[in-house]
Swiss-Prot record:
GO terms for biological process: maturation of SSU-rRNA. Belongs to the RbfA family. The gene is rbfA. Monomer. Binds 30S ribosomal subunits, but not 50S ribosomal subunits or 70S ribosomes. It comes from the Bacteria. It comes from Shouchella clausii (strain KSM-K16) (Alkalihalobacillus clausii). InterPro entries: KH_dom-like_a/b, RbfA, RbfA_dom_sf, Ribosome-bd_factorA_CS. This is Ribosome-binding factor A. Keywords: Cytoplasm, Ribosome biogenesis. One of its GO terms (molecular function) is ribosomal small subunit binding.
Length: 118
């Protein structure tokens, strides 16, 4: 069973992280980013933020580089907004589930077209 506190902290971090990325990050590489989820370990020491980026592969890499550069600032801001003894160490990862879902949807659409043509 998942640690309820870790889940609650993850949801709060997702909300605050989204706000920080929209309002406080001035890096032009960090644009069109959506935070889709945050997984926090049970001991609240590490957190992985899952993001999606609108754009091609080059823009995704540039965005990830910008987020890695701003990681210290983001962690400091999270520490100010969320009352924890220690702010979790952040890492960023791309959320592939949306692309996977779109691919499945297009495959199903193609199957339906083929069935209707036959």
């Amino acid at each position: 069973m998942a640690n309820n506190r870790a889940v609650r902290v993850g949801e709060q971090m997702k909300k605050e992280l989204s706000d920080i990325l929209i309002r406080d990050i001035k890096d032009p590489r960090v644009r069109f980013v959506t935070v889709t989820g945050v997984d926090v370990t049970g001991d609240l020491q590490q957190a992985t933020a899952f993001i999606t980026v609108l754009g091609d592969e080059e823009e995704r890499k540039a965005t990830l580089a910008g987020l890695e550069k701003a990681k210290g600032f983001i962690r400091t801001e999270l520490g100010k907004r969320i009352r924890l003894r220690k702010t979790p160490e952040l890492s960023f990862s791309f959320d592939e589930s949306i692309q996977y879902g779109n691919r499945i949807e297009s495959l199903l659409r193609d199957l339906n077209k083929n069935d209707s043509n036959e």
